[in-house]
Amino acid sequence: MRADTADYPQLFLEDVPMMDTRAPVEFAGGAFPNVLNLPLMTDSERQKVGTCYKQHGQRAAIELGHRLVSGRTKELRIQAWADFARAHPEGYLYCFRGGLRSQIVQQWLRDEAGIDYPRVTGGYKAMRNFLLDTTRQATAQCAFVLVGGLTGTGKTEVIAALGNALDLEGHANHRGSSFGKRATPQPAQIDFENRLAIDILRKRAAGVGRFVLEDESRLVGSCSLPLELHQGMQRYPLVWLEDSFEGRVERILRDYVVDLCAEFVAVEGPQAGFAAFAARLTQSLANIVKRLGGERYQRLSTLMARALAEQEAGRGVALHRDWIVGLLREYYDPMYAYQRESKAERIVFSGDREAVLAYLRECAAGAVDG
């Protein structure tokens, strides 16, 4: 029989399959990648046992739990756990603290299915704390450089091209702007933090000591950056990415119109997908009405509505350039120009995509200080 483990780095570095025996509501609040929720108790059962524990103590709560999970219900749950164990003989199971729930699942698997399956010592809480420490240690021990630039310069493309970059927007499933929502939901805050920490862990294990990040605000959509990382981003050196105005317009057209529409269509189908895409784009503009001002908003909204109607009629996406041009010139560019001025003393390099990539790769190799 394999022993229980507290080797948290190995679990995440090797993407070991794990069975989470917490209740669904706990799992939804935060979990790890490559984990399947096969709970010992449903949310309702867990609530009843918790109430019993508070009123009558541990022994009564355990007895109630055994009554609630018995007979056919118990058989089906053991079968699900056994199926997972057989499919993933290298895996582990865990509960919140690595205590009673995971021990019961272990015992039932052994007694009823003849399967010895190890658990993670300390459970979810210990693994979560390990990942939080991973991020904190990286911000204290590693070097970081930020990639900034005007909207549409392709900062995300630079991040994707570098092996030592942390894709904050990818982990948050959000493009990081007022128009950044995707067709699929953002992860829970804890899931976002866990994914980021695992990314850091794996890159550090591969020898990365200098990380590249996109210059983001504290919030990437609804996901909040870890405090230590955000504080560091107020002082990290900054590389400024440049591109032509025309190139930026075309990139925004691709990312926020063509690709976003395709995402919605893939999720919801052609008709419903386009309707959802149009509603999302329209709402994104409405979200910044106070910052745009009423007259400017009405003008851009009219241009957007005309472009969406043209697109829905099958006549292409060319008209979207009209509102994109207006939004860049009248809103985003002045805002970013102010931000660049406020961060000017931290800018260590500026250039186009190829020049920035070359500089950042030299930084990663230690050829220049970043």
UniProtKB/Swiss-Prot annotation:
KW Transferase (keyword) present: yes
Domain Rhodanese intervals: 12-136
MF terms (GO), sorted A to Z: transferase activity, transferring alkyl or aryl (other than methyl) groups; tRNA 2-selenouridine synthase activity
BP terms from Gene Ontology: tRNA wobble uridine modification
UniProt-listed Enzyme Commission number(s): 2.9.1.3
Substrates-to-products reaction catalysed: 5-methylaminomethyl-2-thiouridine(34) in tRNA + selenophosphate + (2E)-geranyl diphosphate + H2O + H(+) = 5-methylaminomethyl-2-selenouridine(34) in tRNA + (2E)-thiogeraniol + phosphate + diphosphate; 5-methylaminomethyl-2-thiouridine(34) in tRNA + (2E)-geranyl diphosphate = 5-methylaminomethyl-S-(2E)-geranyl-thiouridine(34) in tRNA + diphosphate; 5-methylaminomethyl-S-(2E)-geranyl-thiouridine(34) in tRNA + selenophosphate + H(+) = 5-methylaminomethyl-2-(Se-phospho)selenouridine(34) in tRNA + (2E)-thiogeraniol; 5-methylaminomethyl-2-(Se-phospho)selenouridine(34) in tRNA + H2O = 5-methylaminomethyl-2-selenouridine(34) in tRNA + phosphate
InterPro entries, A to Z: P-loop_NTPase, Rhodanese-like_dom, Rhodanese-like_dom_sf, SelU
Class in the EC hierarchy, top level: transferase
Keywords: Selenium, Transferase
Catalytic-site annotation from UniProt: 95
Subunit and partners: Monomer.
Chain's role: Involved in the post-transcriptional modification of the uridine at the wobble position (U34) of tRNA(Lys), tRNA(Glu) and tRNA(Gln). Catalyzes the conversion of 2-thiouridine (S2U-RNA) to 2-selenouridine (Se2U-RNA). Acts in a two-step process involving geranylation of 2-thiouridine (S2U) to S-geranyl-2-thiouridine (geS2U) and subsequent selenation of the latter derivative to 2-selenouridine (Se2U) in the tRNA chain.
Family of this protein: Belongs to the SelU family.
Listed name of the protein: tRNA 2-selenouridine synthase
Organism encoding this protein: Azotobacter vinelandii (strain DJ / ATCC BAA-1303)
